[in-house]
């Protein structure tokens, strides 16, 4: 006999959370509310932008709550009135206090985009690429008051391709996380899960990205710069200075050779690429975006922007 459906409150904000919300909406359990970050003004026109999770929740006619802070008394009272069985959290954007986590009958399950205890924090997907990891994954865990410190429920590994960008890996992990959450709920209901405490001595961290993280230091090796390009696509992007303008680099290829010139100097120009000296090896650049312009293939960039051998990126 199937257990009765659980009454679930879902917490999430960016696109990473969408597959998890979809799988809940399509499943047997009842999503009684969706909690997401408040609408924000963005861009030069200060246009009000709603979160991807709110957009999906509106499409399904779900009850939406958007507290500035989850510790607000009015929000906590609203949660108690809903009387949920479980919270499911995926990239919500706030740490939930103990007073909130204690409300649901069966606690709160978080979907995190790393193999905890490695890469706790806000930007695990970018940092696994930047650090040259070959494998990452997703974790479901019981939430406590710490940042990604709760007991582990299930984990699933996801290999990282050698040309993988943060954008592509993000989408694969979001999908894997949703499937893992579905499996986690089934096993919780069947009593087949034993939460495992994390080994905090093995914890590593993935702090939020800053725009300046994208600045390319050409004295680093081509492999490290290539990882930086892939890790910071789409944001903040990996960028350099050309003619006092910011130039984002989206696609590179590593060419092995001993250092022979000044890091950042253009050493070869093809019809659809340029090769730039680094601290170790060459980086072949194939796709760029000049500040205030659209992303373009290097072939198109060269047509309108004179670059010569010896040009130095800073």
Give the residues covered by each predicted segment.
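An anion-binding loop in the catalytic cleft
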Residues: 2, 219-314
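N-terminal Rossmann-like dinucleotide-binding module
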Residues: 2-45
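Conserved beta-strand segments of alpha/beta enzyme cores
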Residues: 30, 61-63, 107
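N-terminal glycine-/serine-/threonine-rich beta1-alpha1-beta2 phosphate-ribose binding loop
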Residues: 37, 41-85
């Amino acid at each position: 006999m199937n257990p009765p459906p659980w009454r679930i409150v879902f917490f999430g904000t960016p696109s990473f959370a969408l597959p998890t919300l979809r799988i809940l909406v399509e499943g047997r359990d009842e999503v009684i509310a969706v909690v997401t970050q408040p609408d924000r003004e963005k861009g030069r026109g200060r246009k009000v932008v709603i979160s991807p999770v709110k957009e999906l929740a509106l499409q399904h006619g779900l009850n939406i709550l958007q507290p500035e802070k989850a510790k607000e008394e009015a929000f906590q009272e609203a949660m108690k009135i809903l009387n949920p069985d479980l919270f499911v959290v995926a990239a919500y954007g706030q740490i939930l206090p103990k007073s909130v986590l204690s409300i649901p009958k069966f606690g709160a399950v978080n979907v995190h985009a790393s193999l905890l205890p490695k890469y706790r924090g806000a930007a695990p997907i970018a940092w696994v690429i930047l650090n040259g990891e070959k494998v990452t994954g997703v974790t479901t865990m019981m939430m406590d008051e710490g940042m990604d410190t709760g007991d582990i429920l299930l984990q699933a590994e996801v290999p990282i391709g050698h040309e993988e960008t943060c954008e592509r890996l993000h989408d694969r992990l979001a999908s894997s996380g949703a499937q893992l959450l579905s499996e986690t709920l089934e096993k919780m209901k069947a009593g087949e899960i034993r939460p495992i405490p994390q080994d905090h001595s093995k914890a590593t961290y993935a702090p939020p990205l800053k725009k300046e993280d994208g600045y390319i230091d050409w004295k680093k090796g081509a492999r490290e710069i290539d990882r930086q390009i892939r890790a910071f696509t789409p944001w903040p992007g990996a960028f350099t200075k050309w003619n006092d303008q910011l130039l984002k680099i989206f696609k590179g290829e590593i060419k092995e050779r001993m250092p022979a010139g000044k890091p950042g100097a253009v050493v070869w120009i093809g019809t659809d690429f340029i090769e730039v000296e680094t601290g170790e090896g060459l980086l072949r650049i194939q796709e760029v975006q000049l500040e205030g312009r659209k992303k373009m293939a290097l072939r198109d960039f060269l047509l309108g922007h004179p670059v010569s051998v010896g040009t130095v990126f800073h």
